[in-house]
Design a protein with these regions (language model features):
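Cys/His-rich Zn2+-binding cysteine-cluster or related metal-binding knuckle/ribbon modules and their
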Residues: 249
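Acidic/glycine-rich phosphate/pyrophosphate-binding loops and surrounding catalytic core
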Residues: 1-212, 217, 226-234, 239-242, ...
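Active-site loop ensemble at the mouth of alpha/beta enzyme cores that anchors a bound cofactor
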Residues: 278-283
């Protein structure tokens, strides 16, 4: 399995390949090869900055001679008008790395900003905000890093690091008890130590999951606030609980106040708006 650094290197290589192709002919035709310059990253709206470390890797991978002065680090609140970094390099390098760096930082900062709003919304409760697998193909590690920078927590990274029995698994497997039993048989056969979470859609499934046992967390899928409170009381701390499905910024605190341990929010990565910023020449 590829490491995070290897996945990010592949992403950077692919992004440069699709953007530059056989050459940035606009830059090559009008900028002298050895011309030097300086650009700064300007924040154009308030938010949480994210992607600084990955941006540094973009610059270093394209041109190791690029000099980056970081003024604001990942996870820091920024205001409109703040300068996050200054980069001194060949002008050709500045121009050819500009868009990829901005695409990464705007996306990651947008995710971190939205995540932070949800986290702040839950202050005073015990509930943690989780992301989901509803990420942009190829960008999952980047987007999940941004969630953590914004103060959220990562759910499973992929299909390999946790067992999550969802409705389709349960239905195809012939029910909750069969699904959990097969999980344990599989994990024992493969010598794997993975946590098991199961999704339940109603109180009958909740009762069956609890009676069966052998699980770490129960996901309450599309439960109302009232039913969530009832379910949490029934679970009584025997298993971790997670709310998921149809939860919005306006309703998330109501669910948290039911006492769930986690709330997963797909909107953190699938419906986010990038944070506005620019990379402009400076003195």
């Amino acid at each position: 399995m590829l490491s995070v650094n290897e996945l990010e290197d592949r992403l950077i290589d692919l992004a440069f390949a699709e953007d530059i192709g056989d050459g940035d002919h606009t830059t090559l035709c009008c900028i002298p090869e050895n011309a030097m310059g300086k650009s700064h990253l300007l924040n154009k709206e308030d938010g949480i900055l994210a992607g600084v470390e990955l941006a540094k890797r973009v610059f270093a991978k394209f041109d190791p001679t690029m000099q980056v002065e970081v003024l604001i680090n990942d996870g820091t609140p920024v205001k409109k008008g703040d300068i996050a970094m200054v980069v001194t390099a060949k002008v050709r390098s500045l121009l050819q790395t500009e868009r990829l760096m901005l695409n990464i930082m705007q996306r990651m900062s947008g995710i971190a900003t939205m995540t932070n709003k949800y986290v702040e919304r839950l202050k005073g409760t015990k509930t943690h905000v989780l992301d989901t697998r509803k990420t942009t193909p190829g960008l999952r590690m980047l987007e999940k890093q941004a969630v953590k920078i914004g103060g959220g927590m990562n759910h499973r990274i992929g299909l390999f690091d946790m067992i999550l029995l969802k409705d389709n698994h349960i239905d195809f497997c012939g029910g909750i008890t069969n699904a959990i039993t097969r999980c344990h048989e599989y994990l024992k056969e493969k010598g794997l130590d993975l946590k098991i979470e199961i999704e339940v859609r109603n109180f009958d499934e909740l009762a069956e999951a609890m009676n069966c046992g052998g699980i770490n967390r129960i996901m309450l899928d599309n439960f109302s606030v009232a039913d969530t409170k009832k379910a949490v009381d029934i679970v009584g701390g025997k298993f971790e609980t997670e709310s998921s499905g149809g939860i919005t910024f306006d309703t998330i605190r109501d669910y948290a106040e039911c006492g769930v341990d986690f709330i997963s929010v797909g909107a953190l990565t699938h419906s986010v708006k990038g944070l506005d910023m620019s990379f402009k020449a400076c003195e």
